[in-house]
Amino acid sequence: MLMTSLLLAASISGTQLVSAGNDDDYTRTIETWREQRLERLKAPGGWLSLVGLEWLKPGTRTIGSASDNDIVIAKAPAHLGSIEWKGDKVTISLNEGTGATIDGTTRTRAELLDDAHEQPTVVAFGNVSFYLIDRAGGKKGLRIKDSEATTRTGFLGIDAYPVDPSWRIEAKWVAFDPPHTLEIPNVIGTLDRMPVPGKAIFERDGKAFELLPVLESDDADELFFIIADKTSGKETYGAARFIYSAMPRDGKVVIDFNKAYNPPCAFTAFATCPLAPPENRLGVAVTAGEKKYRGSSH
């Protein structure tokens, strides 16, 4: 019986992958990763520049900074133009003389490709730009960015737990054949049905835990974990933290909780982030990765 118990524990326990001699190298690797993450976040078109989200309705709506527009954007020309949503297409028509561009050109009319495309159509004027987003339930909206947004210019940086090699875990991987489907809630009140190729099982503090990663696309080459834990809403952002992992190999998957990072919603009220599903709310304090943003008001 004792041997059986030991074998069972060994089959699910998470393995620490960093030896004591390699701690310094590993710490530098994580610190470099964090620096790169910070630079992406702070980029002029990064998540810190998000200043608005305008949901569209079928039909034609005017857009500009003047109060008589259907959609008012503070830094836009007074009467920028109009947006028409008809069937599956959304089209932008710019008024003459606005100085606005469509994908960097002086065109005045174009179909707006949404963010499901690798390069959505971008309408820009001054420091401000917007593009179309498409969400579950047939919702379409304009995501508005301003490189001079106070969320970007007044950014306070990101606090994080000290790098802890014990939180880089090799978990057992159990593949699902066929893949399962998981309903992922989001902050705008809809559900995204996403494929789950399997589950990761690991042990921490003598207890076994499971996590369900999702695939973000049919050709995804990484697993996407949306997690919460006992630090959520206290030391870390309450809605979720994100982790990407390489695809499983030989029945194992590496989950590096030191790379757990805040979703865009931790920094702005205008993002459409997924929330951690009940299946991924861990009953353990994950004292690794990013902490709650000090500058957040939500």
Task: Name what the model sees in each region.
Residues 153-216:
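Conserved, compact domain cores that house catalytic/ligand-binding motifs in diverse enzymes
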Residues 17-54:
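N-terminal pre-domain segments of enzymes
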Residues 17-19, 95-96, 101-171, 179, ...:
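C-terminal boundary/linker segments immediately following FHA domains
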Residues 103-116, 208-259:
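An exposed acidic His-Trp-rich patch
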Residues 49-50, 55-122, 244:
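Forkhead-associated
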Residues 157, 230-234, 252-254, 258-298:
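Extended, aromatic/histidine-rich regions of cofactor-dependent oxidoreductases associated
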Residues 75-78, 82-91, 191-237:
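Mid-length scaffold segments of soluble, non-membrane domains
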Residues 3-14:
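Bacterial N-terminal signal peptides
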